[in-house]
């Protein structure tokens, strides 16, 4: 597979990286601002797809400078994430109130951080609005169906945000690379997907597609971490080990996918995630810029007075309390 700059050298797609702009003033200091400058609140990307560039964003560090860029500090990361979480809640309330339908697709290299990003998107919102779909291998019955058929029942209804942790694009990535699907079926799939996604968008759905890109050295480090850390070993599969050796096969499959399925109605957005913290913030900020939400007026909520009941007495029940070890 390729590094960040090779990504666009091999592919006809122009990597889209929307510049981050403030959503509205909140009296807080945005990421990267120097002390004493005007605060503009959380960073939210413009709804525009942004300028077409080759490689990484024009304002991103290049070459050795990129490698030398220090990882974001946890304190600053959590500060910015709190602001973005508040915006995600505002987006959620707008989706519920307007009946909007939002479908988000996450694809990318193994270890690129899809699961971690999705976790940070969903950890402060309602699971009744935000729902994650991660389908397992198809059953024999599903294999006999139209390929995209098993994904359709999971599409969002009014007032829902559905996040696909991998999607119908398995047919364009892992399946051809691992030899699960013959080339003619992959070609046919790539020919049909634009029309399929056009129908999704024409039905009123907001479709957002992300590709998470991680460099080869960072991927190696993350896989070794999974091998050596008993808390992460469950993340490591035989498929990860097989695909690790096929970096450039995945690169070619990715490039073919971009060429065939990057459309004006369903474009691909590329996120560089060697720095997980920066990557997550950039993705969430960009996501907020793709949904035309407006914050709803907040209710003035006050707790009611709790009623007294002087007649109530705690019963003498044989309650089993858990040990208080901490």
Put a short name on every predicted segment.
Residues 9-326:
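Glycine-rich phosphate-binding loop of ATP-dependent small-molecule kinases
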